[in-house]
């Protein structure tokens, strides 16, 4: 057995508690309607309706459904001038029949005129640098000369400037939304199909905006492969820090798919960055109805301690020591209390791990002997009750502390 020649003693470094909270990257606040992205504000939840924007009633209903579920900013697609003009009616009807909701217009292929029109009616315009000034790829091209590269850059500036000026003068916002799958041809030739190409694509547009004194910018670096997405966002954050830029980042894994894997894939990308302090707003993109995206967003934020909008349940995985049907009881406790906000409730199957593992919980439900459970308030055991009365008595305990509200 190896023996240390010098005993290890406490040092300042060792005795300093390690922080368990996330330190977020400092960003500027960007207003989108009455919602603020960045600037230390809570991470904002977004989604996008899948209705045709020409369907006025359907679009209004879809926006309202999302907003009522907690979607704070809603994006709509605008593929034509007719769609852009329809947004004026959508916004008007939404305000008249429901309330004002921050809206974002999604503009793509050669959308210069569309973007200028839609900027009158929405709070933010999303553009894709790879498609905003879109030129069909040439099959025989082998490279871009420096002059060709710069000439296209000049054309981009000329095309983008009217939109930037319009948004600046209205104090509205722009998202520079780079997609890994749609980088411009000249970026692909110069940087390859890489995170570096994605970052340089965004920086080109950012610099144009800065030169026109417009800084209400949000940046995204989306990709369908999580490792590419992570590398692109991390590089973007690092490059912005090096350049003294403090723009908020919009997180998302594009084309994540559906079901369990789609949720896991989105979480793997989004939560990893949020845990590093990167990210100010997010969208979970699922091949399902948009309404199903919202709970996933809030669950990610809850799990990381960035926003607390529901009950946090702590429950052991069950083992041979468990003194009651843990899965069934957890379901009963959740059903009775999941409308509450901001509580931590622990459901533990035995005394071995129970009190220790649930020490940070507001309330605990612990099996101590067959047929009985012990209820805790924090670390304090309050009472022992028959298992058949456990859920009811837990509710009574929460009520006695004035922390209960009746479900709507």
Curated annotation (Swiss-Prot):
Pathway where it operates: Isoprenoid biosynthesis; isopentenyl diphosphate biosynthesis via DXP pathway; isopentenyl diphosphate from 1-deoxy-D-xylulose 5-phosphate: step 5/6
Positions of the UniProt region annotated as Disordered: 1-25
Keywords: 4Fe-4S, Iron, Iron-sulfur, Isoprene biosynthesis, Metal-binding, Oxidoreductase
Cofactor: [4Fe-4S] cluster
GO molecular function: 4 iron, 4 sulfur cluster binding; 4-hydroxy-3-methylbut-2-en-1-yl diphosphate synthase activity (ferredoxin); iron ion binding
A Pfam family this chain is assigned to: GcpE
Residues that bind [4Fe-4S] cluster: 316, 319, 350, 357
Catalytic class of the enzyme: oxidoreductase
Superkingdom of origin: Bacteria
Record keyword rRNA-binding present: no
GO process terms (BP): isopentenyl diphosphate biosynthetic process, methylerythritol 4-phosphate pathway; terpenoid biosynthetic process
Co-factor: note: Binds 1 [4Fe-4S] cluster.
Reactions performed catalytically: (2E)-4-hydroxy-3-methylbut-2-enyl diphosphate + 2 oxidized [2Fe-2S]-[ferredoxin] + H2O = 2-C-methyl-D-erythritol 2,4-cyclic diphosphate + 2 reduced [2Fe-2S]-[ferredoxin] + H(+)
EC number, UniProt record: 1.17.7.1
InterPro entries named in the record: Dihydropteroate_synth-like_sf, IspG_bac, IspG_bac-typ, NO2/SO3_Rdtase_4Fe4S_sf
Oxidoreductase as UniProt keyword: yes
Membership in a protein family: Belongs to the IspG family.
Known function: Converts 2C-methyl-D-erythritol 2,4-cyclodiphosphate (ME-2,4cPP) into 1-hydroxy-2-methyl-2-(E)-butenyl 4-diphosphate.
Official protein name in the record: 4-hydroxy-3-methylbut-2-en-1-yl diphosphate synthase (ferredoxin)
UniProt organism field: Acaryochloris marina (strain MBIC 11017)
